[in-house]
Amino acid sequence: MTEEEKINGESNYSASNIQVLEGLEAVRKRPAMYIGDISSKGLHHLVYEVVDNSIDEALAGYCDHIEVTINEDNSITVQDNGRGIPVDFHEKEQKSALEVVMTVLHAGGKFDKGSYKVSGGLHGVGVSCVNALSTHMTTQVFRNGKIYQQEYECGHPLYSVKEVGTTAITGTRQQFWPDATIFTETVYSYDILATRMRELAYLNAGIKITLTDLRVKEEDGSCKQEVFYSVEGLKEFVRYIDSSREHLVNDVIYINTEKQGTPVEVAIMYNTSYNENIHSYVNNINTIEGGAHLAGFRRALTRTLKKYAEDNKMLEKAKVEISGDDFREGLTAVISIKVAEPQFEGQTKTKLGNNEVMGAVDQAVGEALSYYLEEHPKEAKMIVDKVILAAQARVAARKARESVQRKSPMSGGGMPGKLADCSSKDPEECELFLVEGDSAGGSAKQGRNRTFQAILPLRGKILNVEKAMWHKAFESDEVNNIIQALGIRFGVDGEDSKEANIDKLRYKKVIIMTDADVDGSHIDTLIMTLFFRYFPQVIQQGYLYIATPPLYLCTKGKVKEYCWTDQQRQKFIDTYGGGSENAVHTQRYKGLGEMNPEQLWETTMNPENRMLKQVHLENAAEADYTFSMLMGEDVGPRRDFIEKNATYANIDA
């Protein structure tokens, strides 16, 4: 952007660019409609909405630094160095443009095509929605050499926009206090915010995002802080995701172009693993269900690699038919496109429906990949050899899988012999417990409610699928038992033989129930890795849970209490034992098998009393990195992670 364009942009961005669509009243009544939910996810979404405004300024070329601060009182401050929200008079609304942006839903420059070419925000509800769901919010605008301010309570302004000082900077500063009467969770997680800020920095090269947590003091007295900044954008992003994997080819194949009016940025890397990891974004939103841009990418990749291999007579020795997903084994890619008016659809509104984008991505990837392969014959041969290996493994996998899928999952035929099924056939109410060990499985079978609770005992640690070739999973009895019991099928949706289909899922609650020790946690992680790599839809749709059996049974006379944490146990000792451990009898449960069926039901299985942890997929790219780091071949990153997090671990020593 030239200096002249920048000056014109600054002078043209005014009240007339602010369009208004609808009122705010509905937001407090039905918050989940606007921000997804009212738990931790929705709470963090408030921050993303405010940051999205600053990112829009950055994409338009007016901002290069965004500061996000978690304050000591758990309020959030977001400040950017953009142009500042317009404060002049809005003719239609008869008030300051700033007040319109802050108090009217869907009011903002992002709905006026002249102000922003593209704009982020999945729900795109804007900062007014954040205002409505905050007990208090303060906005300061640095513009025209002056500081303007307005404060609000639950979305209502406390006074008109006023000047409160002079300044040499430009930008906007927002501080808000989420409403505890609306949100079930009001404590911000630094890690969740850091993950999203890191992602935004990779997706928008050249923008500096500073995240500070004033609640946490470091050893030197300073506050916890990270600066996220990327020079190479997606190139660095794909290297970060793949940092715990062995690279097949050291190059990142990078594409940054515009086709058919759509900006397309793609980074591709091949590794020696057996998983396909493609992360796609539209206007900075992670489209976890894919869509037109992902279809265009896959089509181009398959066509271009296949043509190169055939032209160079590399497939003749393969003796197997090569399919689309063979080309994607061991592939890590990030696709980021910008669309002026994205149409989102699918289960979680994260699937791109704009079909015109498919051709643009197809053309961009096809041209760039073709050029790369011609210029790098050695690397191209390594990629094609890997494809042939994948095809041979796929044929072996199909044979193994067909033996699993021969019987219908709904008929009860073909169910694992160890499965103690429930009598109900309604997936909405049915629960499947994946239980560690036969002895605990026996207690669970006796203690359960047979109407809606099914039990599948697992023998020891299941296969670590992160290190195994695709078809090896289907040769594992324990993995097969889980797939059969759930009613999951593969390759029924067309071109991708590895795509899981959960339309006939037999249970809408899948609960991992293991011992409360290190081995139990390891088994939890192995099972979660299987779900994430083979049927992530179960996690995405919120069906996977982890049971939390109690650690202790504390007794004093006739008073008995189960304790899930050391803090609860200490509270019992303080209350009933006068602070003396010796005055209280404590039974430590090392394993589920130590509980009788009634105790297991009462503490861990009864929906009235139990505590379940729902497994969330907050950020697919970060989860991809974490699973490959924890469960993959490379020991170094795993050791670093353990050393960094050892203080939080529950270790039986």
Residue ranges and their predicted role:
Residues 91, 345-358, 562-568, 572-573:
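Helical (often loop-to-helix) elements that flank the catalytic cores of nucleotide-handling enzymes
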Residues 2-17, 24, 48, 56-58, ...:
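GHKL-family ATPase ATP-binding module
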